[in-house]
């Protein structure tokens, strides 16, 4: 695919997707005047399909959507599909991180296990009855305080034992090789015809 609509307005996701999808030409939906789809699904996969179908129908082109978030099993899967608005509709990344750290304040290291989950949906056209779906998982733990300035979202509190740092302290080159989004996109590439 030479050109694809990115069904997101999240600048962090756009930057990562553009890097990971190169040399494909990526057009953020906002560049075409397309607003975000309402995320009414109950799972990451449902929301990715809703967003990709919305962008594809309005652009009349193939569209790719990523719905991803942080899952903390000891919090019954929170923040989950509500990761971007965990501390409220108008919350920013720092607000969401503080909400998470507050809820986890008394948890042991073992209870701080977490993972990022990414679902990617590719609609080849708006009425695509068989969208391509790929998923990726990125395991780590939630640190007790934020550290690092790279990345976005919960990266400053997502600690990676293997690298002895948070995802926000990793160089983009490494993160773009090991993250949930990178794993999902690699899976998607394997589904695409040559």
UniProtKB/Swiss-Prot annotation:
GO molecular function: dITP diphosphatase activity; ITP diphosphatase activity; metal ion binding; nucleotide binding; ribonucleoside triphosphate phosphatase activity; XTP diphosphatase activity
InterPro entries: dITP/XTP_pyrophosphatase, ITPase-like_fam, RdgB/HAM1
Pfam families referenced in this protein's UniProt entry, alphabetically: Ham1p_like
Cofactor note: Binds 1 Mg(2+) ion per subunit.
Record: residues binding Mg(2+): 38, 67
EC number: 3.6.1.66
One GO term describing the cellular component: cytosol
Alphabetized UniProt keyword annotations: Hydrolase, Magnesium, Metal-binding, Nucleotide metabolism, Nucleotide-binding
Cofactor section: Mg(2+)
Active site: 67
Catalytic activity annotation: XTP + H2O = XMP + diphosphate + H(+); dITP + H2O = dIMP + diphosphate + H(+); ITP + H2O = IMP + diphosphate + H(+)
Binding of substrate, residues: 8-13, 68, 152-155, 175, 180-181
Top-rank EC class of the record's enzyme: hydrolase
UniProt GO BP: nucleotide metabolic process; purine nucleoside triphosphate catabolic process
Function: Pyrophosphatase that catalyzes the hydrolysis of nucleoside triphosphates to their monophosphate derivatives, with a high preference for the non-canonical purine nucleotides XTP (xanthosine triphosphate), dITP (deoxyinosine triphosphate) and ITP. Seems to function as a house-cleaning enzyme that removes non-canonical purine nucleotides from the nucleotide pool, thus preventing their incorporation into DNA/RNA and avoiding chromosomal lesions.
Subunit structure: Homodimer.
Family in the record: Belongs to the HAM1 NTPase family.
The protein's name: dITP/XTP pyrophosphatase
Organism listed in the record: Legionella pneumophila subsp. pneumophila (strain Philadelphia 1 / ATCC 33152 / DSM 7513)
Top-level taxonomy: Bacteria, Pseudomonadati, Pseudomonadota, Gammaproteobacteria, Legionellales
């Amino acid at each position: 695919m030479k050109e694809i609509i990115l069904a997101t307005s999240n600048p962090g996701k756009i930057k990562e997707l553009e890097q990971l999808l190169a040399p494909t030409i990526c057009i953020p939906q906002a560049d075409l005047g397309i607003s975000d789809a309402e995320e009414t699904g109950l799972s990451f996969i449902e929301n990715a399909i809703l967003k990709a179908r919305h962008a594809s129908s309005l652009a009349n082109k193939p569209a790719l959507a990523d719905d991803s978030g942080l899952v903390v099993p000891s919090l019954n899967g929170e923040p989950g599909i509500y990761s971007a608005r965990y501390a409220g509709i108008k919350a920013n990344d720092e607000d969401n991180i503080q909400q998470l750290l507050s809820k986890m304040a008394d948890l042991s290291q073992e209870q701080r296990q977490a993972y990022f989950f990414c679902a990617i949906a590719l609609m080849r056209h708006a009425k695509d009855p068989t969208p391509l779906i790929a998923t990726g998982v990125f395991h780590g733990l939630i640190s007790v305080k934020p550290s690092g300035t790279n990345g976005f979202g919960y990266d400053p509190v997502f600690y990676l034992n293997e690298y002895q740092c948070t995802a926000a302290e990793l160089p983009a080159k490494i993160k773009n090789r090991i993250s949930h989004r990178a794993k999902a996109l690699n899976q998607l590439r394997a589904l695409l015809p040559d």
